[in-house]
Amino acid sequence: MLCTIIRGPSFLEARNQLLRSLKKCRCFEMRADLLTVSDAELQKLILLAPISVLTWKKPPSCTPQAWVKKIQSLAKLHPTYLDLDKDFPEEEILHIRHLHPNIKIIRSLHTSEHTDITQLYTQMLASSIDYYKLAVSPASTTDLLNICRQKHSLPQNTTVLCLGKIGQSSRILSPILQNPFTYTIPTGADPVAPGQLSLNHHYFYNFTNLSPQSQICALIGDTSRSIGHLTHNPFFSQLSIPCPYVKLPLTPQELPEFFSSIRALPFLGISVTSPLKTAIIPFLDKQDSSVKLSGSCNTLVIRQGEIIGYDTDGEGLFSVLTQHNMDLSNQRVAILGAGGAARSIAARLSRTGCELLIFNRTKIHAEAIASRYQAQAFDIKDLPLHSVSLIINCLPPSSIIPQALAPLIVDINTLPKHNSFTQYARLKGCSIIYGHEMFAQQALLQFRLWFPTHSFNHLEKNFSRRAAVLASLFSIAA
């Protein structure tokens, strides 16, 4: 159940926040400690809410006696739920329950530390409590996933959420984790706790279609330059696929623990970005022929506990070149970089009859790819010395690339759309294919692997168009 937090601070602001959210939410938490309203006005807000939660965070200067008195006065307003800190006296909870038997009690704990939530729950357990809320602070994505795993072992009357930016995915996954409450804020309001998402954000992530039976799709690696969450979630919604797509920042060092976690959680598909495309291969149960050919993996499919790796990067770029009527036979093609995407592209283009030239800052890495696909390897500084028909840039946007020209330039980076290399090439009259085109094509290939029973040919153009618009918008914002 979505629960929108009302913080005001004035009565008028609080009422507007509540009324603005009523179409999308029925449950509202009134933060009495943040509201500058009278008890009569607070009562009006409670009556406006179909389901109400009343919370008052005890300030450090408040005495135990004053705390109890304040909570007793709030109980007299008859909210649906009363949220009490874990340290609120047990005997006073029993007294409130005796006087107000219809009020349901939530016992909550917020901590800035990452702690074993099973132990926390055990410490909070009491017969007088209806619901429990645990808010903890994960230090990493693997911490986050371990917390999600632990949540499955707790009773269904327990809400577990993670604070901070790292913890945002736990809020998106809340219905899948069977949380009784999913806390959100009115659209346009400031967060009350770090990592809170707006009501519109939750709807964007397909909240109304999510349930404990839903599966999860995600992006792992350096997620900072991806627009995948902005393209994939609306696409899933259009197809009525009850699945969110979340970003999970991950380093190579975290892979062992990550793979333990995803086997215990309902993951269906995972996109893999740098720097994990080659590092991830030893953890796969099976490799598709595309991975065996390229030595790179950008797609995981999880079925019946088995993790299968695929590579759609090279095929995605080849689809783009085909759409642009680019015939590569007997052409000289330069690939800049020696990472996972460069490997994938070299593997696919090696079957087109073109002559491949691999350029990299560390020549030995270029040689490793070249030897595999009968290509030539060069230091990146030698790029201007070679005449080619096509340059495919697989280096990061911040890379310093020698000024070189070709009739057609492909830059596979989605964000930023423009960089010094493409700007120079465009100034000199070269045709440019930007990264959002390859992004869209490789993603559509991933969707076919994740959702083989769905037909979405009619939506492909809209998906590609959305990727193009987002890449342009983010470049303008930058």
Curated annotation (Swiss-Prot):
Pathway: Metabolic intermediate biosynthesis; chorismate biosynthesis; chorismate from D-erythrose 4-phosphate and phosphoenolpyruvate: step 3/7; Metabolic intermediate biosynthesis; chorismate biosynthesis; chorismate from D-erythrose 4-phosphate and phosphoenolpyruvate: step 4/7. InterPro entries: Aldolase_TIM, Aminoacid_DH-like_N_sf, DHquinase_I, NAD(P)-bd_dom_sf, Shikimate_DH, Shikimate_DH-bd_N, Shikm_DH/Glu-tRNA_Rdtase, Type-I_3-dehydroquinase. Keywords: Amino-acid biosynthesis, Aromatic amino acid biosynthesis, Lyase, Multifunctional enzyme, NADP, Oxidoreductase, Schiff base. Residues 1-208 are annotated as: 3-dehydroquinate dehydratase. One of its GO terms (molecular function) is shikimate 3-dehydrogenase (NADP+) activity. The keyword Metal-binding does not apply. Bifunctional enzyme that catalyzes two sequential steps of the aromatic amino acids biosynthetic pathway. In the first reaction, the AroD domain catalyzes the cis-dehydration of 3-dehydroquinate (DHQ) and introduces the first double bond of the aromatic ring to yield 3-dehydroshikimate; in the second reaction, the AroE domain catalyzes the reversible NADPH linked reduction of 3-dehydroshikimate (DHSA) to yield shikimate (SA). In the N-terminal section; belongs to the type-I 3-dehydroquinase family. In the C-terminal section; belongs to the shikimate dehydrogenase family. This is Shikimate biosynthesis protein AroDE. It comes from Chlamydia muridarum (strain MoPn / Nigg).
